[in-house]
């Protein structure tokens, strides 16, 4: 995934155009998805740019475009995972000539940066799926063995002082909560299938 602060980067769009794997572009930190739709349109086309070859030499790279890019709703000034926000984003995707499906990031702006709220976000997406929605095709969840996060500064903090299984970056839900989220989503997909 390409983050909210990097989605506007032309370099990242060019690199994404040459990757033969699905790439998600997050909406802007303000919640705007236009920068993500613009990024998808750019990455879907071929580009020429200077890069470093696998042998370490400077080379001109030509990409063919990546047809497998998508939007990731990560929230902004307000969360954007509810059914109305998802429908509005899909309408914008359709207007841009893109598939009206997307991924939802349960963390960041959608959880108000409170890792436990990711479960609430996932439950809402599960309700949308159970009701028959096919607009959301995937979720991102910050998950680890233990919940929360711990501070670590390389060169300052001792590795031996770290708690095993706890994130040193973003706060995460714990493993048991992750299993419950996956089961809830699985049940929702089964309900949608009838």
Where are these regions (language model features)?
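Active-site-facing alpha/beta catalytic cores
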Residues: 1-81, 85, 108-109, 113, ...
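Catalytic-site microenvironment of enzymes
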Residues: 94-95
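Extended, intrinsically disordered, low-complexity segments
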Residues: 177, 185-194
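Conserved, mostly hydrophobic/aromatic
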Residues: 104, 174
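Short loop/turn motifs at secondary-structure junctions
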Residues: 98-99, 135
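Conserved active-site beta-strand-loop modules that form the wall/rim of enzyme catalytic pockets
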Residues: 69-70, 100-102
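Acidic, Ser/Thr-rich peripheral helices and adjacent loops at domain boundaries
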Residues: 151-172
């Amino acid at each position: 995934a390409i983050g909210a602060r990097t989605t506007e980067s032309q370099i990242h769009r060019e690199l994404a155009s040459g990757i033969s794997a699905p790439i998600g572009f997050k909406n802007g930190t303000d919640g705007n998805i236009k920068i993500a739709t613009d990024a998808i349109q750019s990455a879907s086309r071929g580009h020429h740019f200077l890069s470093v070859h696998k042998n370490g030499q400077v080379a001109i790279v030509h990409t063919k475009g990546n047809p497998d890019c998508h939007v990731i709703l990560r929230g902004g000034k307000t969360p954007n995972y509810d059914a109305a926000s998802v429908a509005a984003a899909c309408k914008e995707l359709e207007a841009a000539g893109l598939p009206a499906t997307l991924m939802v990031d349960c963390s960041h702006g959608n959880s108000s940066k409170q890792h436990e709220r990711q479960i609430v976000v996932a439950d809402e997406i599960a309700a949308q799926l159970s009701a028959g929605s096919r607009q959301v095709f995937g979720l991102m969840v910050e998950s680890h063995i233990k919940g929360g996060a711990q501070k670590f500064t390389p060169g300052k903090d001792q590795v031996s002082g770290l708690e095993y299984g706890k994130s040193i970056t973003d706060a995460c839900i714990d493993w048991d909560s992750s299993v419950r989220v996956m089961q809830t989503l699985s049940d929702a997909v089964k309900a949608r299938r009838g």
